[in-house]
Amino acid sequence: LARSIITLTTDFGSADHLAGTMKGVILSINSDAEIADITHHVLPYDLLDGALAIGQAYKYFPAKTIHVVVVDPGVGTERRPLLVSAGTHYFVAPDNGVLSMVYEREEQLTVRHITSDHYFLQPLSTTFHGRDIFSPVAAWLSKTWQTNAFGEEITDFVRFTLPKPKPAGKGVKGVVLRADNFGNLLTNLAAEDLPQVIAGTSFKMRVGNVEISKFAQTFSEGGPNEPVLLMGSSGFFEVAVNRGNAAKVVSANRGTEVTVEFA
């Protein structure tokens, strides 16, 4: 029998016991579960960063993987815990929009409000639902696969959309979504937004106060401190600096406007 795979995506960091405690809860309920960390370094309380992390990773896991996502600034409030069936994957997360990229990409969605509290750890804390709700629900689901046992289906779940690129003059205007650990700047510009760049048409890109005109295939193509545009592994264009930090070189971060113009 194939082992159940449960992934964890949180903003807990790795210095504290929180992520380890969640694993203990899961293994106490299903000792055969295989637990994979996607990341515990989502920016604290940052729902967009969490949505990007899970949105870019989940498809690379086998069918029937259960993804636990805990970026939960509203823990202990009225926000609902959710169990989501999306395509061939399952997600256990708070109802705060952190699954928005999953909702955007999957047409087959069933979203349930988790109300069956006999699956929760008791006494239920008001501050650590990752331990008391999301982990045990994921573990029990991995044993039973009975999604309807956890609560009723809902349609009014919270979701947000990524900012969309807009036409601007002879080009396109976009925005930086995040800077990764290397300082690479992930934009909201996808291949279909800039087919001319991929085809080799000359362009001028402005990020903050810096102009970029080089489209690279690899990180190593730029010179020292030379920002280049490249197609990232996530399907979005990125600004990068060879062995350097593009976010620092161009003084940009999330929300910085990006414009690409063609002659």
What do the predicted segments below correspond to?
Residues 4-7, 33-36, 65-68, 81-83, ...:
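Structural motif
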Residues 4-5, 17, 29, 35, ...:
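Active-site histidine-anchored catalytic micro-motif
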Residues 186-251:
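A conserved acidic, glycine/proline-rich C-terminal tail/linker
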Residues 3-41:
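N-terminal glycine-rich anion-binding loop in soluble enzyme alpha/beta folds
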Residues 121-188, 193-198:
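Anionic-ligand-binding alpha/beta catalytic cores of soluble enzymes and soluble regulatory domains
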Residues 17, 21, 30, 45, ...:
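Conserved active-site and cofactor/substrate-binding residues in soluble primary-metabolism enzymes
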Residues 37-57:
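N-terminal beta-loop-helix "entrance" segment that forms/cooperates
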